[in-house]
UniProtKB/Swiss-Prot annotation:
It comes from the Eukaryota. Pfam families: HemN_C (PF06969), Radical_SAM (PF04055). Residues 40-274 form the Radical SAM core domain. S-adenosyl-L-methionine 2 binds at residues 103-104, 162, 174, 199. Residues 1-39 form a transit peptide. This is Radical S-adenosyl methionine domain-containing protein 1, mitochondrial.
């Protein structure tokens, strides 16, 4: 199998993973593996969604609402109430990390962040060393609040730089300048040295490989120890999608996009960054502990309008993990939380084969892949060699040096990571065929 046969589909924006999780589900260490409650069943991470933005970027179709006259006190009370309700429902005793995303959570009051964290500590154990991340829009207003956010309990920032090119920022509809971005990163590094991540996008309209490499080199002069790369995604219905569809703008093709991605990997590696996941790079071991929890299949609780969660509702007598989606519209969500403690719009019980699919989809994103020990926690009845070892399709992927199955486990090669979205359907089909041969269907 050659790279020409495979269609390049790189990782899109981080938030889009949540859309995928809502259909595939997430991993739960089931009682099939042990009669005892495993450690992951009593701990989880927490995602808190702030839905408001000052404006909508031209490429964004995520769940966000233009800030008007939202009541910060009401939002704070509801975020606290839903956090308490879902913590009690999950019965987790330890929160391993907290991530405030959006929307633009740097628009929230620092007192709101402090209040949510206080609720967490009252209802579970949150270590003083736990990672607490806040996404920041690098505007002067966002920069001015950084210190107050650290006083509220934030110890890691994720800065949405997106580009260091003024024309690209304008095309993307961003409300910050290159100078604003650089100043915000610098201030964040002073407050949280070694714990500042920068988001940057590639495959932008009119962007060349040389322009992209120049931006990366400029970024390396100012960034901290974590960088996330995101390929521009043209989402139907967005302003940017319409501009490209009409021919007013053009984006790089697949081959150029692939070169951009490989260029980034090379440039970052030469600067001491280790690629630990498809789109994430860290040096000095500054990985995102919160995101590692997602990729390793740990439980997580989603709070706020449109947030997604994956946990076992032990408080309701549940024994299987559920995929949960909170109500999208902030006003409706607020009313639901005020009336019944939570605004959960959808609950889906996740079955065994769905869980194994999630182990593969999320685990193969990581450079470390899936170890035999990790797989056994979810599938004690069939190990990786039994499921994939005799498959001609898997052997072809191994022969093409895209996939590795050995005594360590199952993982992608460097080329395989680049083409992950293209080879995943083959891997998932083999998983389904194996379990169907044993009489296990996807919804059992």
């Amino acid at each position: 199998m050659s790279t020409r046969v495979l269609t390049l589909t790189l990782l899109k924006k981080r938030h889009l993973m949540q859309c995928f999780w809502s259909t595939v589900g997430s991993v739960h260490l089931r009682s099939i593996a042990s009669d005892k409650i495993p450690s992951h069943a009593v701990e989880a991470s927490l995602y808190v969604h702030w839905p408001y933005c000052l404006k909508r970027c031209s490429y964004c179709n995520f769940n966000k609402y233009i800030s008007r006259s939202e009541n910060h006190d009401t939002m704070t009370e509801c975020l606290q109430k839903e956090t308490e309700t879902l913590l009690k429902l999950s019965q987790v005793s330890r929160i391993t990390s907290v991530f405030f995303g959006g929307g633009t959570p740097s628009l929230a009051q620092p007192s709101t962040i402090a209040a949510v964290l206080e609720t967490v500590t009252k209802n579970s154990n949150l270590s003083d060393l736990a990672e607490v991340t806040l996404e920041v829009n690098p505007t002067p207003a966002g920069k001015a609040r950084l210190k107050d956010f650290t006083l509220a309990g934030v110890n890691r920032f994720s800065i949405g730089v997106q580009s260091l090119n003024a024309d690209h920022l304008r095309i993307l509809g961003r409300d910050h300048s290159v100078q604003h971005a650089l100043q915000t990163v610098s201030e964040a590094r002073k407050l949280c040295p070694g714990r500042v991540s920068v988001d940057i996008m590639f495959a932008l309209p009119g962007q060349s490989v040389s322009c992209w490499q120049k931006q990366l080199e400029e970024l390396l002069y100012v960034c901290d120890d974590h960088i996330s790369l995101y390929q521009l995604t043209l989402e139907r219905g967005t302003q940017l999608f319409k501009q490209v569809e009409s021919g007013k703008l053009s984006v790089p093709g697949d081959e150029v996009t692939a070169i951009m991605y490989k260029t980034a990997c090379r440039v970052l590696e030469e600067s001491g960054f280790h690629q630990y996941e498809v789109s994430n790079f860290a040096r000095n071991n500054a990985v995102s502990e919160h995101n590692m929890g997602y990729w390793r299949g740990h439980q997580y609780i989603g709070v706020g309008p449109g947030a997604h969660g994956r946990f076992v509702p032990h408080g309701d007598g549940g024994v299987q993990r559920e995929a949960r989606t909170q109500t999208l519209e902030p006003d409706v969500w607020i009313k639901e939380v005020q009336s019944r403690g939570r605004g959960t719009r959808r609950r889906i019980t996740l079955h065994h084969l769905q869980l194994l699919e999630e182990v593969l989809v999320m685990g193969l994103r990581m450079n470390e892949g899936i170890t035999h020990q990790h797989w056994e926690l979810f599938s004690p009845e069939a190990n990786l060699q039994q499921v994939f070892g005799k498959s001609a399709n898997i052997q072809e992927l191994q022969g093409g040096r895209f996939l590795i199955l050995d005594d360590r486990g199952l993982r992608c090669s460097w080329e395989g990571l680049v083409l992950l979205d293209s080879i995943l359907p083959t891997i998932l089909l083999e998983l389904e065929m194996f379990f169907h041969s044993r009489g296990i269907k996807r919804t059992q």
